[in-house]
Amino acid sequence: MIESFSRLTQAGPGSPRRATVQAAASGLGSADDQVFSRLLENRIVFLGSVVEDAVANAISAKLLLLAAEDPAADIYLYINSPGGSVSAGMAIYDTMQYVGNDVATVALGLAGSMGQFLLCAGTAGKRYALPHARIMMHQPHGGIGGTAADISIQAEQMLYTKRTLQERIAFHTGQTVEQIETDSDRDRWFTAEEAKEYGLVDHVVVRADQVPSVVSGAGMGLRRAGRTGFGPGGGSGR
């Protein structure tokens, strides 16, 4: 998979082949695609919708593409999402762990449910929230129906999913699994500062230059006319 992406990107950032990969990964066909392609050239991936299979495929493809282009450079994942499918979110999460790059995360607007999960899964020390971002944590939801046997199987899977998410959030935040279970039993809302205190993020930032990579001219910058402007891992705690 990585080798395939490498071959597609050998011609460089401005190549037609790379533009084709970007367009396919974005899932967009409008003028917005130009914006997201430009961000991708600067190693910025934007999650700005409900997390579903198509979105997860696009985000995961972008992470793999950026990892293939430069296995060492940070990737920045901006999150403004109310959450969505657990399986789709876990696909993004596992890809964040799969690539060798640090994946910094930045919350703006709302990072709720699976959005919160992906936010806290950023590389330790590189998880950011803008000052008015809201973060919401809760337990996974899902409908159960069918025969008694079906209901039993579905309930077992729900408990497994719930426990897995709690264990991963505990790992990334430093909280105990028991504390996460208690706090996520109902919707738990955090301001940016409260999220920092809880361990969901590491920094609350107001300006791009408060992120070290911006100062060094890497990652978050929109490279234009010599200017560097803008730019966020995972289960291993890297």
Swiss-Prot record:
Keywords associated with the record: Cytoplasm, Hydrolase, Protease, Serine protease
Location in the cell: Cytoplasm
Catalytic activity: Hydrolysis of proteins to small peptides in the presence of ATP and magnesium. alpha-casein is the usual test substrate. In the absence of ATP, only oligopeptides shorter than five residues are hydrolyzed (such as succinyl-Leu-Tyr-|-NHMec, and Leu-Tyr-Leu-|-Tyr-Trp, in which cleavage of the -Tyr-|-Leu- and -Tyr-|-Trp bonds also occurs)
MF GO annotations: ATP-dependent peptidase activity; ATPase binding; serine-type endopeptidase activity
Entry annotated with the keyword Magnesium: no
Domain of life per record: Bacteria
EC number: 3.4.21.92
GO cellular component terms listed in the entry, alphabetical order: cytoplasm; endopeptidase Clp complex
Function per UniProt: Cleaves peptides in various proteins in a process that requires ATP hydrolysis. Has a chymotrypsin-like activity. Plays a major role in the degradation of misfolded proteins.
Record-stated family: Belongs to the peptidase S14 family.
The protein's assembly and partners: Fourteen ClpP subunits assemble into 2 heptameric rings which stack back to back to give a disk-like structure with a central cavity, resembling the structure of eukaryotic proteasomes.
PANTHER family: ATP-DEPENDENT CLP PROTEASE PROTEOLYTIC SUBUNIT
Protein name (record): ATP-dependent Clp protease proteolytic subunit 4
Organism expressing this protein natively: Frankia casuarinae (strain DSM 45818 / CECT 9043 / HFP020203 / CcI3)
Gene (UniProt): clpP4
